[in-house]
Amino acid sequence: MQDLEIIKDFLRNKRGYLKKGNEACAYGLLRKTNKTFSFDLIKQAKKEVKNEIKHQQSKPLLSRDVAEDFRDHVEENRQKLENTPFAPTLQKRKEPKFAINPSIKDQVGMHILLGCNHVPFHNQRLHAGIRNLMRDYKYNIKGFHLMGDFADMNTLSSHDRKMFTAVPGLTLNMEYDACNEELDLFEQYLPDGCWKTYLYGNHEDRHNRWMKNMDNAKTPLLSPMDGMLLEERGYQVKNKWSQDFFTLGTNFQIFHGVYFSIHNAKAHLDKLRTSCAYVHTHRIQNYREGTMSAFNIGGCADYDSAAFNYASRPMKAQWANGFAINMIDEQGRSNLTQIYVNPDGTFWFGGRLY
């Protein structure tokens, strides 16, 4: 049972995988050990490791009662609790680390720009096509940029306050599990050293707004950054959705989106006076003045899903699926291609239908 012990050691050291699906665990093991393992063996290992952790937490104390022991070892016990998947509400919210952009020479190549995926309400056909494109261009990719609302955070939605979620029974942990699976699937086609960024959108900001309530903050829910293990995955994270941005090349900004007007691309360029790309509105637009351009690149969600029942028919009629590819050259100049998506989730790029 050597393979079983290998999997168990992996799960003991990376307990976040205990909350992930078997496919995500198999991919993590493949990257770590260069070996493939059956889902049945992974399932058995997860069960045994979870039982180990439960047993460790429930061992009887011989010398003093539980309350005295916890007081005597409060910091040690707090850390133990925060590192187990069975006490997610005890996690403290971390602030993202300061982000440093790669040098221009390390950015030269292809950058994938996605946003408004709204996982688990994403367009599955579109996601599959994007992964196929990434597979074909894997060694050209220098940046993978998630521009906000990758996670829908439907369980914290104000649209559903005091009501069932769009999918009855949906929990925040289930949403994070779905996000982790999608991230695993995308990341298998990213080369080592790829620059990965994650911007919060107004949907991830639902967690920030939730935590501003004093009663909620007493038993905090996992943040998107923690629930998706973003920093552990190597993403540079920014969590102030209406303020934050990343700069690609010399001066091309990417952010979630600020303005929601009919001609929002012009509004962004008028106010920011720099070339940029954003999502947020679920629309596709572009506006150019001289050497500056603003691109609203659409979204990657399934707009027919129950999560968008709040939107009126005229509002949905303006929405479009899309994403973008930005080629950075040696001078740091951006050359952006907007990808328009067909109603069935397919799209064309490089003379091929994905």
Q: In which residue ranges do the predicted regions lie?
A:
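Short, amphipathic alpha-helical "recognition" segments used to contact nucleic acids or chromatin
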Residues: 1-20
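Short, basic interhelical loop/turn and adjoining N-cap
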Residues: 18, 27-51
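Basic, amphipathic N-terminal segments that precede the first structured/catalytic domain
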Residues: 43-139, 246, 352-354
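Core catalytic region of metal-dependent phosphoesterases/phosphodiesterases
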Residues: 98-99, 114, 119-231
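Flexible, charged surface loops at secondary-structure boundaries
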Residues: 104-107, 135-140, 190-192, 230, ...
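Structural motif
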Residues: 109-111, 142-145, 252-253, 275-277
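Metallo-beta-lactamase
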Residues: 218-251
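Conserved beta-sheet core of the metallophosphoesterase superfamily
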Residues: 251-350
